[in-house]
């Protein structure tokens, strides 16, 4: 399939919440399609009605939309190989099954699990070896007898009795030995098609040229290659796609990151205030890199450089601190206007209200852009602007609002009450004169009590700008309250 235009697919099952490992797979497929000028197909594998949910499907759509991973064909937009939901393709699978049986590539198997185990035991083999290919050569009479007993067959593919080898784009030449893979089931006993059938059949019918997926699916590859070869022989497939098995994503210790690990939940990162650029940059580093000496890059730069053959086969560890640091870098790379818009949308989504007008909010955003790791950090720095959210941090007050803060705050109040235009420059001038010149205080001793009294915390945006945003009346009221707190602590 090397001479064909690249067609890749992202085909999740709609169960649970999107996992960062799943999204890493989507990103690598998307980037490879965009790098090669190929097609990114989005397909939903929803044949398990007991586990699949519409809510999970919508969550996957939400994730792709938020991250900007646009697809060229899929369930919401259609395409030449629609439908793109497996639950709507059952007639196609039934037709393929019938053709495989008619060509002798697949057969009806009636053995129960108990019968298979009994045959293994009788032959002195491990009873847990799995299916023993017993039904391969049943006669028509034997099949009729089983049906008369009320048995429903599963359909199994006749596996080739030879090694199966392929050149994995990530792992190199990979071989599974002859006899290690028994004939496998394509359907359940009720005729429902299994993943083992529908996934390769859809790839064949949708002309997928490259399969980029997690290494947990590596053991299923020889079976799928055998099925592709059978599909070629019956005229359903044009060829066998190339495979690239992406490295596992590990959590704490050496365990694979699971859905139970909080950092695996894509939406928890969004709720904290990750921006798409930061999260995608980090996910790209889970198995790939743009250069040995460079970790920060844009999505466009990734697309220009990405080739799946450069993906590392070693497991990648999810490092939350590194992810946070990269997100902070991407927040700093946003223009002031773009950052303001992102922060406003984040605050609105989380019910945070600073009470500022647009111009004031833009100024507040400018003050915190270089001081945060995730958008959620900004509320911790700006919530002092909301009277309902303002609280005096006990530790900060115990440190800064002691008896020696009373004369500092008295002098600050006296200086600020004489300020005409309540601007950053005027506030700075008044406070520096009152505290640094007149009282001859060091800056930390001078401004620490003011910061805690005005913002409630020892860490805040720049002090003079914060007082301007807070406004004259509220600033003076907070300093008076801080002065009373210090006096009471004396």
Swiss-Prot record:
Q: Which GO terms describe its biological process?
A: glutamyl-tRNA aminoacylation
Where along the sequence does the record place the motif called 'KMSKS' region? 256-260
Q: Which gene encodes it?
A: gltX
- Name this protein carries in UniProt: Glutamate--tRNA ligase
Q: Which SUPFAM superfamilies match?
A: An anticodon-binding domain of class I aminoacyl-tRNA synthetases, Nucleotidylyl transferase
Species of origin: Mycobacterium sp. (strain KMS)
| Function, as annotated | Catalyzes the attachment of glutamate to tRNA(Glu) in a two-step reaction: glutamate is first activated by ATP to form Glu-AMP and then transferred to the acceptor end of tRNA(Glu).
Enzyme Commission number(s) = 6.1.1.17
Swiss-Prot/TrEMBL catalytic activity:
tRNA(Glu) + L-glutamate + ATP = L-glutamyl-tRNA(Glu) + AMP + diphosphate
What InterPro entries does UniProt report for this protein, alphabetically?
aa-tRNA-synth_I_cd-bd, aa-tRNA-synth_I_codon-bd_sub2, aa_tRNA-synth_I_cd-bd_sf, Glu-tRNA-ligase_bac/mito, Glu-tRNA-synth_I_codon-bd_sub1, Glu/Gln-tRNA-synth, Glu/Gln-tRNA-synth_Ib_cat-dom, Glu_tRNA_lig_a-bdl
Keywords assigned: Aminoacyl-tRNA synthetase, ATP-binding, Cytoplasm, Ligase, Nucleotide-binding, Protein biosynthesis
Its localization reads: Cytoplasm
Q: What class of enzyme is it?
A: ligase
Fetch the Pfam families from UniProt. Answer: Anticodon_2 (PF19269), tRNA-synt_1c (PF00749)
GO terms of molecular function: ATP binding; glutamate-tRNA ligase activity; tRNA binding; zinc ion binding
- Residue spans making up a coiled coil are none
- Give the binding site residues for ATP: 259
Q: Where is this motif: 'HIGH' region?
A: 12-22
């Amino acid at each position: 399939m090397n001479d064909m235009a690249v067609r890749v697919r992202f085909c999740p099952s709609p169960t649970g919440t999107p996992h960062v490992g799943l999204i890493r797979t989507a990103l690598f497929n998307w980037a490879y399609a965009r790098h090669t000028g190929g097609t990114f197909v989005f397909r939903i594998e929803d044949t398990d009605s007991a586990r699949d949910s519409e809510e999970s499907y919508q969550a996957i759509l939400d994730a792709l939309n938020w991250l900007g991973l646009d697809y060229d064909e899929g369930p919401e937009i259609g395409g030449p190989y629609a439908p793109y939901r497996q639950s709507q393709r059952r007639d196609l699978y039934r037709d393929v099954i019938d053709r495989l049986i008619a060509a002798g590539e697949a057969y009806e198997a009636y053995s129960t699990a108990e019968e298979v185990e009994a045959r293994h035991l009788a032959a002195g083999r491990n009873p847990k070896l799995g299916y023993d290919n017993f039904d391969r050569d049943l006669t028509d009479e034997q099949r009729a007898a089983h049906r008369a007993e009320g048995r429903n067959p599963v359909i199994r593919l006749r596996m080739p009795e030879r090694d199966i080898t392929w050149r994995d784009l990530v792992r190199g030449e990979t071989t599974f030995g002859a006899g290690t893979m028994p004939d496998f089931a394509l359907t359940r006993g009720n005729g429902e098609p299994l993943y083992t059938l529908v996934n390769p059949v859809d790839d064949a019918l949708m002309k997928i040229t490259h399969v980029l997926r997690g290494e947990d699916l590596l053991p299923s590859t020889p079976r799928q290659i055998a099925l592709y070869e059978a599909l070629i022989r019956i005229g359903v497939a044009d060829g066998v796609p190339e495979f690239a098995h992406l490295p596992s994503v590990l959590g704490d210790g050496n365990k694979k990151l699971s859905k139970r690990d909080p950092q695996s939940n894509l939406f928890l990162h969004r709720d904290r205030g990750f921006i798409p650029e930061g999260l995608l940059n980090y996910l790209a580093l889970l198995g790939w890199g743009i250069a040995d000496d460079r970790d920060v890059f844009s999505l466009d730069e990734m697309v220009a450089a990405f080739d799946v053959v450069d993906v590392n086969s070693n497991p990648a560890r999810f490092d939350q601190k590194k992810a946070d640091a990269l997100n902070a870098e991407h927040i700093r790379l946003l223009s002031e206007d773009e950052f303001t818009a992102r922060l406003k949308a984040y605050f609105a989504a989380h019910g945070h209200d600073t009470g500022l007008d647009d111009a004031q909010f833009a100024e507040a955003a400018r003050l915190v852009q270089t001081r945060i790791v995730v958008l959620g950090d900004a509320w911790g720095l700006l919530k002092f602007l909301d009277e309902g959210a303002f609280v005096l941090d006990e530790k900060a007050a115990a440190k800064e609002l002691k008896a020696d803060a009373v004369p500092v705050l008295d002098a600050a109040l006296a200086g600020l009450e004489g300020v005409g235009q309540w601007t950053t420059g005027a506030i700075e001038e008044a406070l520096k004169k009152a505290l640094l010149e007149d009282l001859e205080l060091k800056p930390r001793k001078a401004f620490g009590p003011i910061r805690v009294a005005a913002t409630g915390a020892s860490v805040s945006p720049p002090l003079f700008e914060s007082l301007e945003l807070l406004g004259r009346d509220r600033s003076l009221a907070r300093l008076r309250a801080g002065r009373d707190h210090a006096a009471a602590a004396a």
